[in-house]
Curated annotation (Swiss-Prot):
It is an enzyme of class 2 (transferase). GO terms for molecular function: DNA binding; DNA-directed RNA polymerase activity; magnesium ion binding; zinc ion binding. The gene is rpoC. This is DNA-directed RNA polymerase subunit beta'. Zn(2+) 1 binds at residues 60, 62, 75, 78. Residues 188-209 are annotated as: Disordered. DNA-dependent RNA polymerase catalyzes the transcription of DNA into RNA using the four ribonucleoside triphosphates as substrates. Mg(2+) binds at residues 535, 537, 539. GO terms for biological process: DNA-templated transcription. GO terms for cellular component: DNA-directed RNA polymerase complex. Its EC number is 2.7.7.6.
């Protein structure tokens, strides 16, 4: 089979009939599958062994040849080649069609490629293909022109003859009438007899005249049609056409069905058509020009690739290998088969019937009907349901065609190529393992034994505990003692991967060193739970085994939990102590007044512990302890304490602290500044962040483990419990509420008197009750004692927040109704007091809405992540520095009123972890930091202190790398805290960072109901999607297209904002809804791009009016706004990566002398390259306008057809790609995963993969100490250390011969 490592590009094209025959191993002639008695495949059938290979390895069908020694022999009795049965997965067959059929993708796809090429409407095409009309294929213009006068004379003569015949017949009838009338007169007949005779004669003459006139007019129509006949014309199947064919059939050719299309395509002159269309584009306007451009795209594709358009009509249908459309026997003798077999059988049956009809010379009408049925059968095989009603199987279920096999989540791309399952894996429930180190996990013994079974067996044989594999297997199954010893030895320092679904970001899979544990549950380190989003309420996790040495090395170096302390989304630690640990450390470091031992002094921590053990000292009492070698931060040392230059105390120091704090500081690194504070959640976060910034990962991991152990130890001893008596309702609650009740009654009274509107009443009531709730909450907080256990949990940050406590102990407050409006009547009781029935009922709305929202959010967020990954998957760091001087100017501080610098609140997620693009200069013009400096926490503090307010930083938005981005523009990798490595897949990390917190974003806002409603403003997840899809928002606000003055025109029905530009251009008129809140006033002067009323702005407008940089700012700011409002930190650079991909394409406006087509979407890099080449030749370059594309559209517009096809609209992408003969450069990750190559990221990058290792002189000398090396030495090439040179004697060797 094809080796994926041997090629770097993958091209798709249109297969010709010869190609299909070349792939095939034989023609499938019969619709039979297998013989139901012998269960062997039928000869020449859909499973025939003669075509597709033997069903059993090394065995022909009749059994004459068995065993591998007959390999390659074709049995003369049954015609089957003796080979492996695996060839039934690769060998194809074919069906020779009795009549050509069109490929449904090219005729029925949108747009119809066949329609564009032949300049026909899809409706007309359908008429021809399905035998409802004839198409003129060719006209012999010269012969027609030459014979026209003679033919016309003949026809005129014929018409004259017909006219003469008509006249003579009518005259004859008239004569007869006169004779009859004379006879009647003579007989003395009555007048009504005469009238009858007269009427009868007139009727007869009328019929004669009509018959002759019809013939004459038909001949005239036939002549007119013949004169004006042209290629491509459609003719209905009627008497006129048959007459035309009979009389003038030698001058033209007309056909029906795919045959007509095929003949047109074979005679189609692509070059001439291309020239004609270019001319039309140059001179045409409007719709005509647009259609010409679209047609030229199709024509150019065929011209460029050399594909024959006739390949869109099939004469041969390929039959895929039988193992890919299997047939399996069920219990009870029935068979289950792939739908494809049924579809193939329909094609074969109809094809055979058509062939028989043609051989019998059946009438054309019957043959045409059979051809149409064959066309429909092939259509159903390729894309069932695309045209007309789908072919159904049992239970009215539409059969799955070849297209359905590729499409959607269950299709080949997403199910089997991008979603493979792996062996060497297992899964189990997780439980907490507080005794583990950060890089360890507890693996159940039985599970480990099963996972490492092959390795255990090999080691047992190596150690001679077993003689062969079978014996070793038996030992393992019986769990002998030696097996456990061997298992312990094997798993030592051998990492395993743990994964928890859903894997929303890269921290969802991490490596750990397994520790064997009893039981059946996997033990997980408590600090990594946040990264996995795991808890221990029944969650399950999967274990995977990295097998190769390279995989183990990557797992250990890149994926080990102790190396993944930082979150890739914002570069801050993810392994923070939580819950019990925080309670324990909070208990340890709290300071209490008036407890045992307060004010005592101790010579060491050990002595203080002794006093505590004797119960004479409280853990939290303020005492003085003598400590040695303590470090203090700048300005933090107590008075009188002397420090050296590193901040370390000189000699011992008697420090006023608590025993708990002294113990807590022992968990931190020796040279870490002494912490004299309560370790609550915020403080711990600060400490861990600082540790991660200052120390190597090994030390950070060790410190985190010590902090964790101390947290659990002291949480146990803190005795924190919760009883109902801890829930204290404030005694002042009733008084507070009665005051607000009076205010509410007053507002209600004003409304009832008609002094206020309903909206104003609601608004005022909501404000009153919000104040009441806040006051009750304040009273409740003040009422809770400091040592109250609920208070301790919330104030330490271990669990819960004040809002939850308020609902339990204070009052629930305002809730919303099912419409999302706030009900202006609060729930005045708390859960502790119990709710009334009415209160309970109105609470249920919010609860139910919350659950429904969460379910919707999860699906939406997952789909957003998928689109983000798809659009950014080929953004990989490809080079060190692209050399650009461009960058973004970002603020880091503002000048306060007192002249001091105030740090910008968004610094953490905007400038942090980037590189300077230009020197950072303060107001005095001094360079504070040179260009290229890394901007970390320390640097930011240094810049602000030096009075720098704005810096220019490198950004992926301004990176000029042709493929991917460069390391300098990206800056630090947030996951490691160092400059990003070449090969890092920053696009996927960006997508994960944005998508992972997606579930936390609300679906939509709550409406307060009434005037101040945020009704039309989309927020939360839908807003993020709207921005990334670059959609025009609902109720979008216009922006000023020029600087100028505003005039507002208000009428009863409408409102207009008129902008008169300063430069005297035409005024711009913006119609505005009456209910919109304007941001400008009559007569106000506005600047370019200023927003005119409240609402979101359309990104496409921002791009058109203000340019690329502004639309970048708008998109990044908009997305950040949503995430910040939910308190989710994400670094700007991730959003910038996605925005870079959205602005990747330009639309060609004028093509100049280039090959580009007007209206074509082109990659900016390719556009610049084409223009550069055109310029060097001295020709006219193309012009283009920048596009902002939504992420879905951008994913489908990628250069890689494999990636686009596996994303969405599979059939459309493949149709287009095959027609254009597209070549996939395999630069992204998806396309390489699909074909099974190493991904071009990380260690899979060619830069790292194609490394050749050459030994240094020292290494050689060390390995071969007795040999002298010269450059010609054979050892430079290979290692011949196994050769015993001394055993050669000179007699054995003569030059040029071997004995």
């Amino acid at each position: 089979m094809l080796d994926v490592t041997t090629f770097d590009e993958l091209r798709i094209g249109l297969a010709t009939a010869d190609d299909i025959r070349r792939w095939s191993h034989g023609e499938v002639k019969k619709p039979e599958t297998i013989n139901y008695r012998t269960l062997k495949p039928e000869k020449d059938g859909l499973f025939g062994e003669q075509i597709f290979g033997p069903s059993r390895d090394w065995e022909c069908s009749c059994g004459k040849y068995k065993r591998v020694r007959f390999k390659g022999i074709v049995c003369e009795r049954c015609g089957v080649e003796v080979t492996k049965s695996a060839v039934r997965r690769e060998r194809m067959g074919h069906i020779e069609l009795a009549a050509p059929v069109t490929h449904i993708w090219y005729f029925k796809g949108v747009p119809s490629r066949l329609g564009y090429l032949l300049d026909m409407a899809p409706k007309d095409l359908e008429k021809v293909i399905y035998f409802a009309a004839y198409m003129v294929i060719s006209v012999d213009e010269d012969a027609r022109h030459e014979d026209m006068p003679g033919l016309e004379n003949e026809l005129r003569l014929e018409i004259k003859t017909l006219q003469d015949q008509r006249d003579s017949q009518i005259a004859e009838r008239l004569g007869r009438l006169e004779t009859d009338l004379a006879a009647l007169e003579a007989e003395g007949a009555k007048s009504d007899q005469k009238r009858r005779a007269k009427d009868g004669a007139e009727k007869e003459m009328g019929q004669t005249r009509k018959a002759f006139d019809e013939d004459i007019s038909r001949l005239e129509r036939v002549w007119e049609e013949f004169r004006s006949l042209k290629v491509g014309e459609l003719k209905p199947e009627d008497a006129v056409f048959h007459e035309l064919q009979d009389r003038f059939g030698i001058y033209f050719e007309a056909h029906m069905g795919a045959e007509a299309i095929q003949k047109r395509l074979e005679a189609f002159d692509l070059e001439a058509e291309g020239e004609l269309l270019r001319e039309q584009i140059a001179t045409g306007k409007g719709q005509k020009k647009i259609r010409a451009i679209k047609r030229l795209r199709v024509v150019s594709s065929f011209l460029a690739t050399g594909n024959s358009p006739a390949a869109m009509v099939l004469q041969v249908v390929p039959v895929i290998p039988p193992e890919l459309r299997p047939m399996v026997q069920l219990d009870g003798g029935r068979f289950a088969t792939s739908d494809l077999n049924d579809l193939y059988r329909r094609v074969i049956n109809r094809n055979n019937r058509l062939r028989r009809l043609l051989d019998l010379g059946a009438p054309e009408i019957i043959v045409n009907n059979e051809k149409r049925m064959l066309q429909e059968a092939v259509d159903a095989l390729f894309d069932n349901g695309r045209r007309g009603r789908p072919v159904t199987g049992t239970g009215n279920r539409a059969l799955k065609s070849l297209s359905d096999m590729l499409k959607g989540k269950q299709g080949r791309f997403r199910q089997n190529l991008l979603g493979k399952r792996v062996d060497y894996s297992g899964r189990s429930v997780i439980i907490v393992g507080p005794q583990l180190k950060l890089h360890q996990c507890g693996l159940p013994k039985q599970m480990a034994l099963e996972l490492f079974k092959p390795f255990v067996i090999k080691r047992l044989i190596d150690l001679s505990h077993a003689q062969n594999i079978k014996a070793a297997k038996r030992m393992v199954e019986r769990s002998r003692g030696q097996v456990w010893d061997v298992l312990e030895e094997i798993i030592r320092e051998r990492p395993v991967l743990l994964n928890r679904a859903p894997t929303l970001h890269r921290l969802g899979i991490q490596a750990f060193e397994p520790q064997l544990v009893e039981g059946k549950a996997i033990q997980l380190h408590p600090l990594v739970c946040a990264a996995f989003n795991a808890d221990f309420d029944g969650d399950q996790m999967a274990v995977h085994l990295p097998l190769s040495v390279e995989a183990q090395a990557e797992a250990r170096i890149l994926m080990l939990a102790s190396n993944n302390i930082l979150k890739p989304s914002d570069g801050r630690p993810v392994t923070l102590p939580t819950q019990d640990m925080i309670i324990g450390l909070h208990h340890l470091t709290t300071l209490k007044e008036g407890v045992a031992g307060e004010g005592r002094a101790f010579s060491s921590v050990a002595e203080a512990i002794l006093a505590k053990d004797q119960l004479s000292l409280d853990l939290n009492a303020k005492v003085r302890i003598r400590l040695h070698d303590i470090y203090f931060g700048e300005g933090e040392a107590p008075e009188g304490v002397e420090l050296d230059e590193k901040g370390k105390t000189v000699g011992p120091v008697l420090l006023e602290t608590t025993l708990g704090r002294a113990l807590f500081n022992e968990t931190l690194p020796v040279d870490y500044p002494y912490i004299e504070a309560v370790a609550d959640k915020g403080k711990l976060s600060e400490i861990v962040n600082d540790l991660a910034e200052r120390y190597p990962k090994v030390e950070v991991a060790a410190a985190l483990d010590r902090i964790k152990d101390a947290g659990f130890y002291w949480a146990t001893r803190s005795g924190v419990t919760v009883a109902l008596s801890d829930v204290l309702t404030p005694p002042t609650k009733a008084a507070i509420l009665s005051g607000y009740e009076k205010q509410a009654a007053k507002v209600q009274g004003q409304f009832e008197k008609g002094l206020t509107t309903n909206a104003e009443r609601r608004q005022e009531l909501i404000e009153i009750w919000n104040k009441a709730t806040a006051e009750v909450a304040k009273a409740m907080e003040d009422n809770l004692p400091a040592d109250n256990n609920i208070n301790r949990m919330v104030s330490s940050g271990a669990r819960g927040n004040w809002m939850q406590v308020r609902q339990i102990a204070g009052m629930r407050g305002l809730v919303s109704n099912p419409k999302g409006e706030i009900i202006p009547r609060p729930i005045v009781h708390s859960y502790r007091e119990g709710l009334t029935v009415a209160e309970y009922f109105i609470s249920t709305h919010g609860a139910r809405k919350g659950l429904a929202d969460t379910a919707l959010r999860t699906a939406d967020s997952g789909y957003l992540t998928r689109r983000l990954v798809d659009v950014s998957q080929d953004v990989i760091i490809r080079e060190d520095d692209c050399g650009t001087g461009r960058g973004l100017d970002l603020p880091i501080a503002t000048k306060g009123a007192d002249g001091s610098s105030v740090r910008d609140s968004n610094v953490e997620n905007s400038v942090y972890a980037r590189s300077l693009a230009a020197d950072a200069v303060n107001e005095a013009g001094e360079v504070v930091a040179p260009a290229g400096s890394d901007v970390g926490d320390v640097m930011i503090d240094h810049l602000i202190a030096a009075g720098v307010h704005e810096i220019k930083v490198r950004s992926v938005l301004t990176c000029e790398s042709a493929v991917g981005v460069c390391a300098a523009c990206y800056g630090r990798s947030l996951a490691t805290g160092k400059l990003v490595d070449i090969g890092e897949a920053v696009g996927i990390i960006a997508a994960q960072s944005i998508g992972e917190p997606g579930t936390q974003l609300t679906m939509r806002t709550f409406h307060t109901g009434g005037v101040a409603s945020a009704d039309d403003i989309t927020q939360g997840l839908p807003r993020v999607q709207e921005l990334f899809e670059a959609r025009t928002p609902k109720g979008a606000s216009p922006i000023a297209e020029a600087a100028g003055r505003i005039t507002i025109e208000d009428t009863d029905r409408s409102r207009k904002v008129i902008l008169t530009p300063d430069n005297g251009d035409e005024p711009h008129i913006y119609p505005v809804l009456k209910r919109a809140t304007l941001l400008v006033e009559d007569g106000q002067h506005v600047e370019l791009g200023q927003q005119l009323h409240v609402g979101a702005i359309d990104p496409k407008e921002v791009l058109r009016v203000k340019g690329v940089r502004e639309v970048q700012k708008h998109l990044v700011g908009g997305v950040q706004g949503v995430y910040r409002s939910q308190g989710v930190p994400i670094h700007d650079k991730h959003i910038e990566v996605i925005v870079r991909q959205m602005l990747r394409k330009v639309t060609v406006v004028e093509h100049g002398d280039t090959d580009l087509l007007p209206g074509e979407l082109v990659d900016r890099a390719r556009y610049n390259e084409v223009n550069r080449a055109t310029l060097t030749e001295g020709k006219k370059t193309a012009s283009a306008r920048q596009e902002v594309m939504g992420i879905t559209k951008a994913s489908l517009a990628t250069e890689s057809w494999l990636s686009a096809a596996s994303f969405q609209e599979t059939t459309r992408v493949l149709t287009q790609a095959a027609m254009e003969g597209k070549s996939d450069p395999l630069m992204g990750l998806k396309e390489n995963v699909i074909i099974g190559k190493l991904i071009p990221a990380g260690t899979g990058l060619a830069k790292y993969r194609d490394v050749t290792v050459t030994a240094t002189e020292e290494a050689k000398a060390e390995r071969y100490p007795n040999r002298i090396f010269t450059d010609e030495s054979v050892f430079n090439e290979s290692d011949l250390s196994f050769v015993d040179f001394d055993s050669f004697s000179s007699d054995d060797y003569t030059p040029g011969t071997y004995n």
